[in-house]
Amino acid sequence: MDFKQYSPEELKECSMIEVVHSVLGDKRQATTFNELVQEIAQVLGLSQEQVNAKIAQFYTDLNIDGRFINLGENRWGLRSWYPYEQIDEEILPQPKPKKKRKVEDDGFDDYIEEDEDFDDADVTEDEDDDVEDLDKVLEDEDGDDDDLDDLDEDEDDFAEEELEYDETEEEEEEEL
């Protein structure tokens, strides 16, 4: 776009985004943000104070507008220049190779496990008492089945009440 053909009034009506789009289209190469701001100021005839007042909104608009893409290192270009696969390659940082650390010797690698046999003679009377206590606990848990039966009955009652409610509701709808 040749900006010389426009009058100063027409240029003031152009938004900064429109100017950047045409500038990038003419250059056909990615440009840093600072260079874009300088060119906009030159084309629109903005003072440094006016540029400073509008720079934050301009940067926001540049990010939001789908026609532009940030290529990293504060360089901007038109999205139409870059196929999707190429964009991924330029934006992704290169992975750094990891340094190999020397493994420290902790002394556990040399331990050889031995099969240890436990005889029944090692069982003490205290352990026998523990087994008997477990038997009592298991017997007590068998008594908890009664509570489950009560819950099943409550669920059956609820299901019957719900069925009756649904039938009553259907009859009322038929009457209408």
UniProtKB/Swiss-Prot annotation:
InterPro entries: Asxl_HARE-HTH, RNAP_delta_N_dom_sf, RpoE. Signal peptide: none annotated. The keyword Transferase applies. GO terms for cellular component: DNA-directed RNA polymerase complex. Keywords: DNA-directed RNA polymerase, Nucleotidyltransferase, Transcription, Transferase. Residues 106-176 have a biased composition (Acidic residues). GO terms for biological process: DNA-templated transcription; regulation of DNA-templated transcription. One of its GO terms (molecular function) is DNA-directed RNA polymerase activity. RNAP is composed of a core of 2 alpha, a beta and a beta' subunits. The core is associated with a delta subunit and one of several sigma factors. This is Probable DNA-directed RNA polymerase subunit delta.
